[in-house]
């Protein structure tokens, strides 16, 4: 891994040297930063430029999660500001705007298409990882969490304060809170409690003029927009105030796999009929993936069923025997544990792994990967599943997550927040693949498009919906920030009927469209 890191740094260094003349002088920008910050909170140590190549490269790579974008247009990067104080964020916004430099905001670096750390025009990365404080108030069941904290850090802090409080969010502990929450993050508590944005009650945001805003000063329209509409189109999210939820002391989890030869297709078909109808205390995710077959060198599809129940094993066994007996769940498949320990289970750590791993922050780049998403309105027929399996087996490594809706998700209006995917959906799909060699990239992307096309007849249509947190350039991009047709395509897929209100909010809070990227919200007048 160290060797790979060194090679990547060398590649990036060559890119810098070749294209040094194509980007603005960082000295003007950094001078602006120093002029707009105080000696009490000096910004000098938070600034990284190519004048100090080693720290510049390491700072860039540390939070680069998709290697497809690790060196793309890197030569356009003017500086990285790893803000340590709110004034650093304010100065970065004001100075970037004043100098005509695009701003990219990075909390954890998990944007699927690298939008938090790449651009085709001169840009600055505003890194939020130093702003990671978390304050939990058990008596009010509320917490403040800064955008640079990770989900693993948030879950750990909640557990330190209470063993019966939780927050409904995702399963990857290294994901940054800032982007995850604002995109409408969901996880295994969504059927019982909803998603992240359903529990946000206040926020701090730096607006286009560098002012610090909260819910009262930003207004209800902007507060609505940043809950599910993607904060990077409207400003820089500093922190969230969230409601925590009560969970039992003991939860039950299980993981059971069925290959096609063991009736995996039949079990998954039945899962489609019941996963949204079982009690909302139960969340069952299905995860088809490529596994070894029974014969040497043979491959097949194994459907893994991950589940979490807010209660004891006895009650879970009763529910499963009535709703999905085809799975053949056994008592020995079940593990009782605290909510905090379930976060390890969902992150795919072995039972018994020390919880301190939730605080790890990997400092090396991730894999090459590509993901796509869909919403499903009616069960996929068995023949459709079989077509999907056939296409999956063309890959070396690929999987699809089937995440059920239902429960409280059916009772929250599509317009309550900017996240619109509520009643009417059975489950969503996330297709993903990873690879190690850059030479495979073109082929892998083509294969993912083929898998997406094969699934097409069985998913939502007009539009074919997509989830904003599973960013996908294939559904449309808007490089100039002015392409009306492309902006409508991806905008309607992500936000459905909420798009118009998002555009109206954008026109009010950022009329000149400073906060933009290839898939941002356009101001209404531009549309």
Curated annotation (Swiss-Prot):
The annotation note on the cofactor reads: Binds 1 FAD per subunit in a bicovalent manner.
What GO molecular-function term can you cite, just one? oxidoreductase activity
The protein's location, in the record's own words, is: Secreted, Cell wall
Keywords associated with the record: Cell wall, Disulfide bond, FAD, Flavoprotein, Glycoprotein, Nucleotide-binding, Oxidoreductase, Secreted, Signal
Q: What is its main location?
A: secreted
User: Which cysteines link up through disulfide bonds?
Assistant: 32-95
Describe the location of the FAD-binding PCMH-type domain by residue ranges. 73-247
InterPro entries documented for this protein? BBE, FAD-bd_PCMH, FAD-bd_PCMH-like_sf, FAD-bd_PCMH_sub1, FAD-bd_PCMH_sub2, Oxid_FAD_bind_N
Is Disulfide bond one of the keywords?
yes
As for family, the record states: Belongs to the oxygen-dependent FAD-linked oxidoreductase family.
The entry's protein name is Berberine bridge enzyme-like 5
